[in-house]
Curated annotation (Swiss-Prot):
Keywords: Cell membrane, Disulfide bond, G-protein coupled receptor, Glycoprotein, Golgi apparatus, Leucine-rich repeat, Membrane, Receptor, Repeat, Signal, Transducer, Transmembrane, Transmembrane helix. The lineage of its organism: Eukaryota, Metazoa, Chordata, Craniata, Vertebrata. Disulfide bonds join C34-C40, C38-C52, C348-C373, C479-C541, C637-C712. It is a multi-pass membrane protein. This is Leucine-rich repeat-containing G-protein coupled receptor 5. The gene is LGR5. Residues 1-21 form the signal peptide. InterPro entries: GPCR_Rhodpsn, GPCR_Rhodpsn_7TM, Gphrmn_rcpt_fam, Leu-rich_rpt, Leu-rich_rpt_typical-subtyp, LRR_dom_sf, LRRNT. It comes from Bos taurus. Belongs to the G-protein coupled receptor 1 family. Residues 33-64 form the LRRNT domain.
Length: 907
């Protein structure tokens, strides 16, 4: 007599009791057998479902109803099971003991459970499969032993489990396949041995599992397979060998004639041999990406008529497209990260049912015609070497919805390349070399990406893309055509189209919503309603225009425009005048006047850059979006940016040098009562020019930050590199102003009262002090702006930032010459000398300057406080001028030994 018959006989008294009591037990009778703190409910079949999970139980509950069909004891603290604790539960079909502390299950623990179909023992501390406790559970269909510490499976532990369909042994410590234990599981259909430590699968490891359909062996340490390890698996359809240490292709799979899904990705397989799947005609899906595959036989995937998906990622050494003859059902093909340089012309003849083609990250240069692949819905060809898209490449692909051609070298696209793609919704052409884009056939696009095509500078009309929702452009100005530059999107309203509509008209239009006179009115109304919906959901275009990239004007506000024009005019005229008077009027140029002249020259460069920006604003007035991209990428923009930074830094460096020169001059005059030239002036000037040029060239070397905005200046926000550059400039200039301040503070501290007025050339000392004060004051807003950006302080409005960059920064270029013209007496003297020279040169162009009357020369020398003296000896003697209240002049001797030089005493 078998066990099931015994179970029926043992339950017969219970059945007789039920019959005597009038049939099925009442709900009240069932619930009286519910343990304390557990939740019980009828299952609709005269039986009881008992849930005692997560109650902290340390032992099995008592007083369980004999009619219990479902018992959940998971997530408790049960550490051991007594013999036959549940023998009376003859109707129990599902027992859950997961998440407890069981380390051992004794024999007889499940005795009497003749109806048990599901047993869950996962997440315990079992170190081996119970040797005898599971035997003779003839009704058991599902057994979960996963997430334990099982390292041993006794040979006879599964004997008697003739109905077992599903077995979980994953996430344990198995090191080998328990071949003997599996021989009694002839009805097993699904088994997982994943997440163990198995190294090898021997021959005939699953020999008696003829009904097995699913086998998971992933995440083990399998490095070798027996050539006949899968023999006997006549019904196997899914085999998972992913995430192992396989070094060779598993040729043992050729015996699996019914295999439909095969995965062996993330291994160390280096090659796939010819006719690798010759014994697997039923294969539908193959996953073998993330293997260091170097060689794939051309016939490896031939004659797989059921194959639907083929995925091969990261096969970096594949150079030829595989031969797919006889694999006509393929719907998805992914071959990425290889070195395929060309596709066969017959690729679509072999794959007429292809729907998804992913050949990204290859070396494709030329493309065949895909017109035969009528079912293609998605093509991904990004990151290749494609140069040209011909007219027939994508012709008549009526089902194509997504086309990705990003990160290629595409410079030419035939005007009709997209003309027969009515279903195309997503097109990605970003990061190519396009200068224009055809629009024929693209009316149905909803997503368009063109970013990274720096040669594509023209505007694209929004009328060509009526269904567009998302678009990415190379330049922000191109988004102006899609209305993103407006602050508020104005929704066209069919009830208020006219500004002069009367109340009666509005009433008629309102009534027209509910009463449509004829079909024509209905069509017009629907068209207007569709326009309103489109207005409610405008196109999302990026990068969007902003306060520094406007659609209509370069400067934006008239305050900035007038300020830039004023600075440009004053800087050019005043600095030109100062430069002329310094370098053309004087017979001899002292060190300080040379520095003043050079400051005027570099300030004139700043005026040139401001004038160019003002000219661009005037030329593009009202239509800057049409020229913004061209201007940003033009060489002129980079030249303007370079000149601005070079002029600004040179001016600061020269002013620093002038302050040091004045301090040196005053020190020498106080000590020797004579003026001594500043040492190594030419070398210092060359160093200043070199340093300023280097500072101005940094944005060019670091990726042309000058082209980041149409203002052609590094913006003190956004990219960390630009912010760091601006902060570095501010710190450098602040250091210069600190040096100047210290030098002049020492100068004034060492002078006694009245000494400054009695000094030679005191006007130049005062002039440099005035320049220092003015430039330092104007430097403060720039420094505040840069450090605010560094600290992410966002309370400064964009208009204020633009005003600082365009007006405050170049303002010293016009104030410096104005201060010299208005307050320095040397200018009037030099201007008079320049006028006399001009008058003289006009009267006598061929007469030498030496013919000037000696009296005029002497008078000019006195008026300009300059005299030309040639020293031919080491001892220098001259008369010093006396000031009011000072003793008469007396001769002085300079202790410095000099060669013959021109020297100008102070007056």
């Amino acid at each position: 007599m078998d066990t099931s018959s015994v179970g029926v006989l043992l339950s017969l008294p219970v059945l007789l009791q039920l019959a005597a009591g009038g049939g099925s037990p009442r709900p009240g009778t069932l619930l009286r057998g519910c343990p304390a703190h557990c939740q019980c409910e009828p299952d609709g079949r005269m039986l009881l479902r008992v849930d005692c999970s997560d109650l902290g139980l340390s032992e099995l509950p008592s007083n369980l109803s004999v009619f219990t069909s479902y018992l959940d004891l998971s997530m408790n603290n049960i550490s051991q099971l007594p013999p036959s604790p549940l023998h009376s539960l003859r109707f129990l079909e599902e027992l859950r003991l997961a998440g407890n502390a069981l380390t051992y299950i004794p024999k007889g623990a499940f005795a009497g459970l003749y109806s048990l179909k599901v047993l869950m023992l996962q997440n315990n501390h079992l170190r081996q499969v119970p040797t005898e406790a599971l035997q003779n559970l003839r009704s058991l269909q599902s057994l979960r032993l996963d997430a334990n510490r099982i390292s041993s499976v006794p040979p006879s532990c599964f004997s008697g489990l003739h109905s077992l369909r599903h077995l979980w042994l994953d996430d344990n410590a198995l090191t080998e396949i328990p071949v003997q234990a599996f021989r009694s599981l002839s009805a097993l259909q699904a088994m997982t041995l994943a997440l163990n430590k198995i190294h090898h699968i021997p021959d005939y490891a699953f020999g008696n599992l003829s009904s097995l359909v699913v086998l998971h062996l992933h995440n083990n340490r399998i490095h070798s397979l027996g050539k006949k390890c899968f023999d006997g698996l006549h019904s196997l359809e899914t085999l998972d060998l992913n995430y192992n240490n396989l070094d060779e292709f598993p040729t043992a799979v050729r015996t699996l004639s019914n295999l439909k899904e095969l995965g062996f990705h993330s291994n160390n397989i280096k090659s796939i041999p010819e006719k690798a799947f010759v014994g697997n005609p039923s294969l539908i899906t193959i996953h073998f990406y993330d293997n260091p595959i170097q060689l794939v036989g051309r016939s490896a995937f031939q004659h797989l008529p059921e194959l639907r998906t083929l995925t091969l990622n990261g096969a970096s050494q594949i150079t030829e497209f595989p031969d797919l003859t006889g694999t006509a059902s393929l719907e998805s093909l992914t071959l990425t990260g290889a070195q395929i340089s060309s596709l066969p012309q017959t690729v679509c003849d072999q794959l007429p049912n292809l729907q998804v083609l992913d050949l990204s990250y290859n070396l494709l240069e030329d493309l065949p015609s895909f017109s035969v692949c009528q079912k293609l819905q998605k093509i991904d060809l990004r990151h290749n070497e494609i140069y040209e898209i011909q007219a027939d490449t994508f012709q008549q692909l009526f089902s194509l919805r997504s086309l990705n051609l990003a990160w290629n070298k595409i410079a030419i696209i035939d005007p009709n390349a997209f003309s027969t793609l009515p279903s195309l919704r997503k097109l990605d052409l970003s990061s190519n070399r396009l200068s224009s884009i055809p629009v024929t056939g693209l009316h149905g696009l909803t997503h368009l990406k063109l970013t990274g095509n720096h040669a594509l500078q023209s505007l694209i009309s929004s009328e060509n893309f009526p269904e567009l929702k998302v678009i990415e452009m190379p330049y922000a100005y191109q988004c102006c055509a899609f209305g993103v530059c407006e602050n508020v999107y104005k929704i066209s309203n069919p009830w208020s189209k006219g500004d002069n509509s009367t109340a009666e008209d509005l009433h008629k239009k309102d009534a027209g919503v509910f009463q449509v006179q004829d079909e024509r009115d209905l069509e017009d109304f629907l068209l207007d309603f569709e326009e309103d919906l489109r207005a409610l959901h405008p196109v999302r275009c990026s990068p969007s225009p902003g306060p520094f990239k406007l659609c209509e004007y370069l400067f934006g506000s008239w305050l900035i425009r007038i300020g830039v024009w004023t600075i440009a005019v004053l800087a050019l005229t005043c600095n030109a005048l100062v430069t002329s008077t310094v370098f053309r009027a004087a017979v001899y140029i002292s060190s300080i006047k040379l520095l003043i002249g050079l400051i005027a020259a570099v300030n004139m460069l700043m005026g040139v850059s401001s004038a160019v920006l003002a000219g661009v604003d005037a030329f593009t007035f009202g239509s800057f979006a049409q020229h913004g991209a061209w201007w940003e990428q033009a060489v002129g923009c980079q030249v303007v940016g370079f000149l601005s930074i070079f002029a600004s830094e040179s001016s600061v460096f020269l002013l620093t040098l002038a302050a040091l020169e004045r301090g040196w001059s005053v020190k020498c005059s106080a000590k020797f009562e004579t003026q001594t030239p500043f040492p190594s002036l030419r070398a210092t000037l060359a160093l200043c020019a070199l340093l300023a040029g280097t500072v101005a060239a940094v944005p060019l070397l670091g990726g042309s930050e000058y082209s980041a905005s149409p203002l052609c200046l590094p913006l003190p926000f956004g990219e960390p590199r630009a912010t760091g550059y601006m902060v570095a400039l501010v710190l450098l200039n602040s250091l210069c102003f600190l040096v100047m301040t210290v030098a002049y503070t020492r100068l004034y501290c060492h002078l006694e009262k009245g000494d400054l007025e009695s000094m030679w050339d005191c006007s130049m000392v005062k002039h440099v002090a005035l320049l220092l004060f003015t430039n330092c004051i104007l430097h403060c807003p720039v420094a505040f702006l840069s450090f605010s950006s560094l600290l992410n302080l966002t309370f400064i409005s964009p208009e204020v930032i633009k005003f600082i960059l365009l007006v405050i920064v170049p303002l010293p270029a016009c104030l410096n010459p104005l201060l010299y013209i208005l307050f320095n007496p040397h200018f009037k003297e030099d201007l008079g000398s320049l006028g006399k020279q001009t008058h003289f040169w006009t009267r006598s162009k061929h007469t030498s300057l030496m013919s000037i009357n000696s009296d005029d020369v002497e008078k000019q020398s006195c008026d300009s406080t300059q005299a030309l003296v040639t020293f031919t000896s080491a001892s220098i003697a001259y008369d010093l001028p006396s000031s009011s209240g000072s003793p008469p002049a007396y001769p002085m001797t300079e202790s410095c030994h000099l060669s013959s030089v021109a020297f100008v005493p102070c007056l």
